Amino acid sequence: MHCPYCRHPDSRVVDSREAEEGAAIRRRRSCPNCGRRFTTVETAILSVVKRSGVTEPFSREKVIRGVRRACQGREVDDDALNLLAQQVEDAVRAKGSPEVPSHEVGLAILGPLRDLDEVAYLRFASVYRSFTSAEDFEREISEMRAARARAGATAD
């Protein structure tokens, strides 16, 4: 790590701590040349591989934009969308791979979105899963009702 003050090509780590709820590492460094201290924050880069094969950095903002479209006209606030985007990023990072197919990002959105707002979930799922008929919607609604019934039965 180059010193930002004197550009010396080496530095010594004085202290390391987790930051951003474990998503990053904050390191306090010291330059052996000029003696000044500086802080670095290290994060693992997460990339999304699109269907076309193009790779782009994971973007919470892009997740929020897509989900916001599905939530249009619904009572969903920005804090809930930010939390959902964080849950999606956590789920994708938990896969342990630096590159994740865009399909897996979509799958990671579905669960938290279903919990957040069922109508928005249906809108998102209809595009993501390419619904082509009313039967596709009916099948998804039936699955949602069955899951709700199972959850109610286990809560008793």
UniProtKB/Swiss-Prot annotation:
Its cofactor is Zn(2+). It comes from the Bacteria. GO terms for molecular function: ATP binding; DNA binding; zinc ion binding. Binds 1 zinc ion. A zinc finger (unnamed) spans 3-34. PANTHER family: TRANSCRIPTIONAL REPRESSOR NRDR. Negatively regulates transcription of bacterial ribonucleotide reductase nrd genes and operons by binding to NrdR-boxes. Belongs to the NrdR family. This is Transcriptional repressor NrdR.
